[in-house]
A protein has these predicted regions:
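A short helix-loop
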Residues: 90-92, 110-113, 132, 136-139, ...
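N-terminal glycine/serine-rich phosphate-binding loop of ATP-dependent small-molecule kinases
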Residues: 1-51, 178-181, 203, 207-215, ...
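Activation-segment/catalytic-loop signature of the eukaryotic protein kinase fold
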Residues: 311-413
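Active-site phosphate-binding/coordination module
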Residues: 19-101
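Glycine-rich phosphate-binding/hydrolytic loop that grips phosphoryl groups
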Residues: 76, 222-226, 275, 279-280, ...
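Cytochrome P450 heme-binding "Cys pocket" and the immediately downstream C-terminal segment
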Residues: 425-494
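Glycine-rich phosphate-binding loops at beta-strand->alpha-helix junctions
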Residues: 187-197, 217, 240-242, 246, ...
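Gly/Ser/Thr-rich active-site cleft segment
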Residues: 80, 86-217, 279, 291, ...
Length: 494
C-alpha cells in the first residue's frame, strides 16, 4: 500500500506537469480512499504488524481485505448475540452483521491466529491508517477515525456511546472487550481533517509540507462524492463487486431497512445520512466465466460481449443467481452460492455470459426496489468504475432490467476524485461540498435509456429470478420451482 501510494501520487504529479503552468506547490490538499472493511493490525507506534520482520510472512498480520469471508461463523455469532441483547447495534445494517466487516475479521484473527492478535496493540481501518501515515501519526490513539468505516462496519454510533460496549464484546470474547480500550472513542465525518502532510511524506511524494489531509473514507463513499451525489441519486461503483450509495437529508426520517449494509449519519457527506448496499461479486463473476472456465482473456471478454449483444433477454432459456461470492444485499448471507438454470445441449458460452450479466442486473434491481420500498428517494442512477466505462452492453441491460436511465461518471477515477473533492473543501479551495462537487464533478454525455420492449421481457424474467432468489435465499420456504424451467423456455421462445 505504501509503495503504491508513492508511485501513484508521483505518477499523478508527473502527468499534471504536462499541463502548462502546473506546479506541485499549487496542491493544497490530499485525500485517500480505500477498500473496506479492511482492518490492519498495528503496533504501539501505529506501524503495520506486517512490516515487522517477525510477522512479515504471516498472512494474518496483513491487511484483512473486505473480500475475505472466513469470519462468517464469527459474523453469525455477532448477529445472534446482538439480536438477543443489543438489537440496536444491527438495526441500521439490515439486522445482520457481515463477515466482510470489522469485528468479524478481528475476532476471526483471535480465533485462528492468536499469536498475531496478541502481538497487535490495536487495529486500524486501512481508510484511516493511510491518512494517519501521511500525517506522521506515531500511535494508534492519535489516528483520526472516520465515521464512514466506524458507522458502516464497526457498529459505532453516538447514540450508544460509540463502539459496542464492553459487556457485549465480553460475551463474544473477553479479549475483544479488552481491545476496545485500545481502539477509539470518537469517529468523525468529512468535516474533520485527518491531519497535515508530515515532512517525511512530503519529501517522498514531492508535495508541499503541511497541506491538509482529508479524512479517510471507503472507495465507494468517496466515489459517490466524485459522481456528484445528492439526494435522489443512487451511485453504483461497478467493478469486481458493486457497491451502491445514496444520501438523504439528515432531517429526513429513514426507517431501518432490512438487508441494507448501513444507514449512517455523515458517512458520505456532512449533514446527510449515508446509505450503503451492494453485491459481493460482479466483475469477478464475468472473470470467473471467461478466464477461469473458458480459459480466455481480454479478447474473449470482447468476443463474448459482441456475441451476447446480439441475443435477446433470457437467451437460450438461461437464468442465473449472482451469488458466486455470497449475497451482500438484500439477503446478507456469505454462504449462498451461484446457480444457473436452463442448460440444454444447445447452450452457448455467449448465452451463459449474457445470463451472468442479467443476473447481476437483477441483483441491482432488487436493491433499488428495497430502497424505494422504505422511502429512499431515487430519481437517477450514476455508475462509475471500470465496467461502467468499458461495457455498454452491461449498462444497457441494467437500464432495461431496472427501468432506470443509467448515467456514467465523468471521471474514470471517480473514487479518487471524491477524495480530492473532500481535500479541496477541507483546504478551503471550495467553501462546501455542493460547491466543490459542482466545480469538480460531471457526468458523461452518454446515457443508457430503458428499452420498453426489453423492459417488459425482463419484468417476466425477473419474476422467475425472484422465485429462485426468495426460495434459495430463505425468504420463501414454500417456493415451488416446478414451472421455472418451462417458463424460461417459454420466455426464450415467445
Amino acid at each position: 500500500y505504501l509503495l503504491g501510494l508513492s508511485k501513484s501520487v508521483r505518477g499523478a504529479l508527473a502527468a499534471a506537469r504536462k499541463t502548462r503552468g502546473f506546479s506541485p506547490s499549487q496542491v493544497v490538499g490530499i485525500g485517500v480512499d480505500t477498500t473496506g472493511s479492511s482492518p490492519l493490525p498495528v503496533d504501539r507506534r501505529n506501524r503495520a504488524l506486517a512490516l515487522d520482520p517477525k510477522w512479515r510472512k504471516d498472512l494474518a498480520a496483513q491487511c484483512w481485505l473486505w473480500k475475505d469471508h472466513t469470519g462468517w461463523r464469527e459474523a453469525a455469532r455477532i448477529t445472534a448475540l446482538a439480536a438477543r441483547h443489543r438489537p440496536e447495534y444491527i438495526a441500521k445494517c439490515g439486522n445482520t452483521y457481515s463477515s466482510e466487516w470489522w469485528w468479524s475479521k478481528i475476532w476471526h484473527c483471535l480465533n485462528t491466529a492468536p499469536k498475531v492478535f496478541a502481538a497487535a496493540y490495536s487495529w486500524v481501518e486501512l481508510a484511516d491508517w493511510i491518512p494517519s501515515v501521511l500525517a506522521g501519526v506515531a500511535a494508534p490513539e492519535g489516528v483520526v477515525r472516520g465515521i464512514c468505516a466506524a458507522g458502516h462496519k464497526a457498529m459505532y454510533a453516538d447514540a450508544w456511546g460509540g463502539l459496542p460496549d464492553k459487556t457485549f464484546l465480553s460475551k463474544l470474547d473477553p479479549k475483544l472487550a479488552a481491545l476496545r480500550d485500545r481502539l477509539y472513542a470518537k469517529a468523525h465525518d468529512a468535516g474533520t481533517p485527518a491531519g497535515r502532510l508530515c515532512p517525511e511524506w512530503a519529501s517522498r511524494l514531492g508535495l508541499p509540507e503541511g497541506i491538509v489531509i482529508a479524512i479517510g473514507e471507503f472507495d465507494v463513499h468517496y466515489g459517490a462524492i466524485g459522481c456528484g451525489v445528492t439526494e435522489g441519486t443512487l451511485v453504483k461503483v461497478i467493478g469486481t463487486s458493486t457497491c451502491d450509495c445514496a444520501v438523504v437529508s439528515a432531517r429526513r426520517r429513514i426507517p431501518d431497512i432490512p438487508g441494507i449494509c448501513g444507514i449512517v449519519p455523515g458517512a458520505i457527506l456532512p449533514g446527510s445520512i449515508g446509505i450503503e448496499a451492494g453485491q459481493s461479486a460482479v466483475g469477478d463473476i464475468f472473470k470467473w466465466w471467461v478466464e477461469g472456465i473458458c480459459g480466455g482473456g481480454d479478447e474473449l471478454h470482447a468476443a463474448l460481449t459482441r456475441q451476447a449483444a446480439k441475443l435477446p433477454p433470457g437467451a437460450g432459456g438461461l437464468l442465473a443467481l449472482d451469488w458466486h461470492n455470497g449475497n451482500r444485499t438484500i439477503l446478507v448471507d456469505p454462504l449462498l452460492t451461484g446457480l444457473i438454470a436452463g442448460f440444454t445441449l444447445h447452450t452457448t458460452r455467449a448465452e451463459i455470459y449474457r445470463s451472468l450479466i442479467e443476473a447481476t442486473a437483477f441483483g441491482a434491481r432488487s436493491i433499488i426496489e428495497r430502497l424505494r420500498e422504505y422511502g429512499v428517494p431515487l430519481e437517477r442512477v450514476v455508475c462509475a468504475g471500470g465496467i461502467a466505462e468499458k461495457n455498454p452492453l452491461l449498462m444497457q441491460i441494467y437500464a432495461d432490467v431496472t427501468g432506470c436511465t443509467m448515467h456514467v461518471a465523468g471521471s474514470a477515477q471517480a473514487c479518487a476524485l471524491g477524495s480530492a473533492v473532500s481535500a479541496a473543501v477541507r483546504a478551503g479551495a471550495h467553501p462546501d461540498f455542493p460547491t466543490a462537487q459542482r466545480a469538480m464533478t460531471r457526468w458523461k454525455k452518454i446515457r443508457y435509456v430503458p428499452n420498453p420492449a426489453r423492459r417488459k421481457a425482463y419484468d417476466r424474467l425477473y419474476a422467475e429470478y425472484r422465485r429462485l432468489h426468495d426460495g434459495f435465499g430463505g425468504l420463501d420456504r414454500k417456493a415451488d420451482y416446478s414451472r421455472v424451467m418451462k417458463n424460461l423456455l417459454a420466455l426464450s421462445h415467445p
